[in-house]
Amino acid sequence: MFRLLATMRRGSASGIPQAWARYASVEAARSGAAELLREDRVLRVMIVRNEIPQAFVEWLER
């Protein structure tokens, strides 16, 4: 399972559904990140493994 962590220009990503979703594959997470990056306030998105501690997978930027 994977999740997305967004770096925002101002505000938080709590109102964006893609930031709350859990993704079964990296490809699905990349697709969710692409949708998240369409939001003007999102600067970059980090894909992490949904485990404790979270493990970094990759960065996606504009």
Model-derived segments and their meaning:
Residues 1-19, 50:
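Short aromatic-glycine-(Arg/Gly/Cys) micro-motifs in beta-strand/loop hairpins
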Residues 2-6, 34, 58:
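Intrinsic-disorder/low-complexity peptide segments enriched for small residues
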Residues 8, 26-29, 62:
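A generic structural signal for solvent-exposed, polar alpha-helical segments
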Residues 11, 28, 52-54:
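Generic "edge-of-domain/loop-turn" microfeature
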Residues 13-15, 22-46:
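A short, charged, amphipathic alpha-helix used as a generic interaction element across diverse proteins
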Residues 15-24, 56-62:
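Surface-exposed flexible segments
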Residues 37-62:
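Short, mixed-charge low-complexity intrinsically disordered segments
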